[in-house]
């Protein structure tokens, strides 16, 4: 809102001369000219109109900023997908950590995303919708996949050491040769998953849904923490191994 102050009419030159010392007249003359100019402009309707138009332009700019916010979000998402897709099949991060996290934070489904062979260490993808995604050969150590949906995803030969899959769904996922040492698989759905030759040493399996695991041949379950009742017996009966040292495990697991 514009608040206009009514300017008082300046003194005439004759009156002004009487109020200042004669030696300072040149300085006050310039000030007197500006006072009169300001007074005359304040009474000009066109100047008032310009002031209102200036305020209106600010309001219009604010309106269009918020009105166009959806387009800016779409553009941001498009750029994030470009980063992911152009780096497909390549090593390194290539900005994919930030791109994946941004899309997930905005609630964008990541169904079928292909980040195979990428370096994604420390990525935060809690609650991500990652059905049928390809994380094969990914290095995602110390990452967060809590409550994520990774059903029917390809995670074989990936490194998820010390990562959290608490309450995540790995149903039907391919996890053969995956490194899950020290990973948190508590309350995780492993139904139908393939865990052949996976490293489960010191993994947390509290309350995990393991009974319908498809295959666990050659997997190392040494030191598994809080395993569900009956899990270790079932695992060893179905080809799992309990070996602390890598060299012993390599010698004991089935040859391909």
Residue spans of the language-model regions?
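N-terminal capping/linker segments that flank leucine-rich repeat
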Residues: 1-116, 220-256
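Tandem repeat scaffolds
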Residues: 23, 88-91, 100-256
């Amino acid at each position: 809102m514009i608040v206009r102050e009514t300017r008082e009419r300046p003194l005439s030159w004759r009156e002004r001369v009487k109020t200042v010392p004669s030696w300072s007249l040149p300085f006050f003359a310039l000030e007197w000219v500006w006072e009169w100019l300001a007074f005359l402009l304040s009474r000009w309707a066109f100047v008032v109109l310009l002031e209102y138009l200036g305020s209106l332009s600010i309001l219009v700019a604010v309106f269009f900023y918020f009105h166009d916010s959806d387009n800016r979000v779409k553009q941001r998402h498009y750029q994030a997908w470009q980063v992911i897709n152009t780096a497909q099949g390549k090593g390194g991060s290539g900005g994919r950590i930030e791109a994946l996290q941004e899309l997930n934070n905005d609630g964008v489904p990541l169904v079928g995303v292909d980040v195979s062979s990428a370096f994604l260490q420390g990525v935060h993808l809690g609650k991500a919708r990652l059905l049928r995604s390809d994380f094969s050969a990914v290095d995602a150590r110390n990452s967060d996949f809590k409550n994520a949906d990774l059903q029917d995803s390809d995670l074989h030969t990936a490194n998820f050491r010390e990562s959290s899959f608490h309450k995540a769904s790995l149903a039907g996922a391919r996890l053969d040769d995956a490194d899950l040492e020290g990973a948190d698989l508590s309350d995780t759905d492993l139904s139908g998953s393939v865990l052949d030759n996976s490293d489960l040493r010191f993994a947390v399996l509290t309350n995990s849904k393991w009974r319908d695991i498809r295959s666990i041949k050659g997997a190392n379950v040494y030191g598994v923490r809080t395993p569900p009742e009956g899990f270790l017996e079932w695992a060893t009966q179905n080809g799992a191994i309990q070996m602390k040292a890598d060299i012993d495990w390599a010698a004991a697991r089935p040859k391909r």
